[in-house]
C-alpha cells in the first residue's frame, strides 16, 4: 500500500509546490466603483502572468466560466443579473480573489470603491445618478445627519477613516426640479490586522490536496485489506484420511 501511496503523495506535493510558486491574478474595476446603476458601463481588467504559448484568460462569474478570453471584460450596459463575484486566471497565475460587483436600479446610488475598510484607509463616496444626469445641491448623510453639502455634485473623500466614520450613509440631491435620495449603504471598518474575508487561494488548494490524498489513502487501505482477507476466507483446511499399511493388518 505504501508503495502505491508514495508516488501519489509526490505528485500532489509537486503540484502544490507549483501552485504556491505562481503569482495570483488580480481583477480591477474601471471605473473603480463596486456599486453601479443599470445601464452603466463597467470594465473588469485582469492582471496576471502569461506564457508565450498561451495568452488567453479565464473569466468566472459566480464560479461559472464566462466564454471570454481577453484581458478586459466589458459590461456595456449593466443589468441586475450582472451582479455577483468575478474572478480571472491566466496561464501562469493562480485564480484571483473575487471582486464583488452590485448593479442597482434607481435614480441615485451612493457609490464606494470597497466593501470593507480598515482604519486609516481613504474612503471615496460618490452620489451617482442614473444615466449620469446632472445632480445639484447634493448632501451626504451619515446615520441620518448631514455630513457634507455640495452645491454642484462632487465626491466625498474621507482621507483617513476612523471608527467614527462607520455607519449608514446615503445621499440626496436635485435632478432637474425633483428631490431624489439614494438607498442607504453601511460602511464598516475593521482592524488593520484583521484577516481577509477570503482565505488565500494557496491555502484552499493545500486543503483540497490533503483531502484528496486522504480519500486515496482510504480507498487503497480497504482495497489492500480486502485483498489480504480474500485468500483467508477462501481457504479450506484439507481433509486427511489415514490408511493402514499392509504390515499393520
Curated annotation (Swiss-Prot):
Keywords: Cell membrane, Disulfide bond, Glycoprotein, IgE-binding protein, IgG-binding protein, Immunity, Immunoglobulin domain, Membrane, Phosphoprotein, Receptor, Repeat, Signal, Transmembrane, Transmembrane helix
An example Gene Ontology molecular-function term: IgG binding
Pfam annotation, one family: Ig_2
Record's GO cellular component terms: cell surface; plasma membrane
Membrane-related topology note: Single-pass type I membrane protein
Gene3D superfamilies: Immunoglobulins (2.60.40.10)
Glycosylation sites: 62, 164, 179
Tissues in which the protein is found: Detected on myeloid cells, peripheral blood monocytes, splenic and bone marrow dendritic cells, and thioglycollate-elicited macrophages and neutrophils but absent from lymphoid populations with no expression observed on T cells, B cells, NK cells or other granulocytes (at protein level). Expressed in peripheral blood leukocytes, spleen, liver, thymus and small intestine. Expressed in splenic dendritic cell subsets (at protein level).
Effect of residue 235 to W: Abolishes receptor ligation-induced phosphorylation
Oligomer status and interactors: Forms a heterooligomeric complex with ITAM-containing signaling subunits FCER1G. Interacts (via transmembrane domain) with signaling subunits; this interaction is a prerequisite for receptor complex expression on the cell surface and intracellular signal transduction. Binds the Fc region of antigen-complexed IgG.
Residue ranges of every copy of the Ig-like C2-type domain listed in the record: 22-102, 119-188
GO aspect biological process, one term: dendritic cell antigen processing and presentation
Extracellular side: 21-203
Phosphotyrosine PTM sites in chain numbering: 235
UniProt protein name: Low affinity immunoglobulin gamma Fc region receptor III-A
SUPFAM superfamilies reported for this sequence: Immunoglobulin
Matching SMART domains: IG (SM00409), IGc2 (SM00408)
Function of the protein: Receptor for the invariable Fc fragment of immunoglobulin gamma (IgG). Binds with intermediate affinity to both IgG2a and IgG2b. Can bind to IgG2a and IgG2b monomers. Does not display binding to IgG1 or IgG3. Recognizes neutralizing virus-specific IgGs displayed on the cell surface of infected cells and triggers antibody-dependent cellular cytotoxicity (ADCC). Confers protection to lethal influenza virus infection.
InterPro entries documented for this protein: Ig-like_dom, Ig-like_dom_sf, Ig-like_fold, Ig_Fc_receptor, Ig_sub, Ig_sub2
Positions in the Cytoplasmic compartment: 225-249
Organism: Mus musculus (Mouse)
Residues in the signal sequence: 1-20
Amino acid at each position: 500500500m505504501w508503495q502505491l501511496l508514495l508516488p501519489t503523495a509526490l505528485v500532489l506535493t509537486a503540484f502544490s509546490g507549483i501552485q504556491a510558486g505562481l503569482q495570483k491574478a488580480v481583477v480591477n474595476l474601471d471605473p473603480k466603483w463596486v456599486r453601479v446603476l443599470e445601464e452603466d458601463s463597467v470594465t473588469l481588467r485582469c492582471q496576471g502572468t502569461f506564457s508565450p504559448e498561451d495568452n488567453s484568460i479565464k473569466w468566472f462569474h459566480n464560479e461559472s466560466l464566462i466564454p471570454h478570453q481577453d484581458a478586459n471584460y466589458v459590461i456595456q450596459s449593466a443589468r441586475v443579473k450582472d451582479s455577483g463575484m468575478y474572478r480571472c486566471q491566466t496561464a501562469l497565475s493562480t485564480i484571483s480573489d473575487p471582486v464583488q460587483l452590485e448593479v442597482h436600479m434607481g435614480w441615485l446610488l451612493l457609490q464606494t470603491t470597497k466593501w470593507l475598510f480598515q482604519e486609516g484607509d481613504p474612503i471615496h463616496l460618490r452620489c451617482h445618478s442614473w444615466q449620469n444626469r446632472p445632480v445639484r445641491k447634493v448632501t451626504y448623510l451619515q446615520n441620518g445627519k448631514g455630513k457634507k453639502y455640495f452645491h454642484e455634485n462632487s465626491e466625498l473623500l474621507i482621507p483617513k477613516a476612523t471608527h467614527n466614520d462607520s455607519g449608514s450613509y446615503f445621499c440626496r440631491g436635485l435632478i432637474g426640479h425633483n428631490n431624489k435620495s439614494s438607498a442607504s449603504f453601511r460602511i464598516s471598518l475593521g482592524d488593520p490586522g484583521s484577516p481577509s474575508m477570503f482565505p488565500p487561494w494557496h491555502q484552499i488548494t493545500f486543503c483540497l490536496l490533503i483531502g484528496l490524498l486522504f480519500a486515496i489513502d482510504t480507498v487503497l487501505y480497504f482495497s489492500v485489506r480486502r485483498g489480504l482477507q480474500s485468500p483467508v476466507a477462501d481457504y479450506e483446511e484439507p481433509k486427511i484420511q489415514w490408511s493402514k499399511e499392509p504390515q499393520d493388518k
